Amino acid sequence: MAAISARPLTQKALKVASPDTLHLVADAPVPTLDQDDSVLIRVVCVAINPVDGKSAELSPTPGATSGTDFAGIVVALHGDAKSRTETADTIKTGDRVMGFVFGNNPHVLGNGAFAEYVTLPRRFLWRVPDHMSLEAAASLPVGIASVGMALHYLHISMSSLLQAVSRSIAAASASQHHDGAFDSDANVFILVYGGGTSTGAIAIQILKAAGFHPITCCSSESASRAKRLGAAATFDYQSATCGRDIRDYTNDSLTLAIDCLSESASMAICYEAIGSAGGRYVSLDPFPVRGCVRRSIVPDWICSFTQFGQSIPWAPPYNLDERPDDHRLAEEWYHLAQKLLDAELIEAPTLEIRSGGLLHVPEGVAAVKLGQIKRRKLVYHISEEALP
């Protein structure tokens, strides 16, 4: 396997050229292994996320490599990482891994998923389980990270999640029936608005494994899959009584909601669905302030890039200071999520796989931005070469 000194010096990469424009560069520097646990990965597949197009349009950083989600093969480790004692859980050269990176990053222009190589700290990578393809793996990282961050912002502790997930894994390994009901969480509903989205589907599965009762708003086309993944009930977001129906179903007990669409209409339904005692609402994007119509509900929103321990120097409202708690939480969450992946408790979304490499990725970014990709995740092969 390639040593650090043998890695190539240049690579192909998609760079932000101007607002809403990505340009393929043939001789971009390969990112360096600066941190003591840095890992260099040969990118095999990437997935397209809404943030890829949104950030390039609203807060472009000319010269920065774009892209978030990827899966690939570890080709090199920082010297300090190589010298550490290896365990069964240690990521090493030759491993298949997946992760997401802060693309379009003003702090680090040369690191993004839309490239032949990417680097990340080892603690922010997941090993791809043997049962999972690299195409499927590329579709999951930012969704898994976002769900973990959302649960943190809902004030659900990692220790309680770990205990519940461990019971789910034990039940699954013993081929026992698992109904999702564990101890104090047995009657706790959590609303996932957008159960047909990739992140919403991941949230349903994780909440089910953690012993909650996930319920979801989604389209009628997405309802059957949401139920198969673990939703206790589905509600059609187009119904004029959607919010009231959820409140009736939960007997006015709903206190927690994750909004994967983060629009005025989705926020309104979440606010109507949350019971009279109030609760917490977390969106995956900045929410419209005019939607805060109930003082008993505490709203917040997440930006998963805060997990890396840096500020986010994008244009408002995405200009965020460092959030040390998010960074600490992420390290715990990655360990827990690896257990879920290994136990086959997280299923990848339906995929649309395209070839053509980096040259055609901007077409996919535009398609996602225009809403042309629905109920599936767009994945591109970056490297068609079989790696050792």
From Swiss-Prot:
Entries under InterPro entries matching the protein: ADH-like_C, ADH-like_N, GroES-like_sf, NAD(P)-bd_dom_sf, PKS_ER, Trans-enoyl_RdTase-like
GO MF term set: nucleotide binding; oxidoreductase activity, acting on NAD(P)H
Enzyme class: oxidoreductase
Protein name (database record): Trans-enoyl reductase tenC
Binding site for substrate: 142-149, 304-308
Keywords from the UniProt entry: NADP, Nucleotide-binding, Oxidoreductase
Binding site for NADP(+): 51-54, 219-222, 237, 284-285, 373-374
Organism this protein belongs to: Beauveria bassiana (strain ARSEF 2860)
Keyword Metal-binding tagged: no
EC number: 1.-.-.-
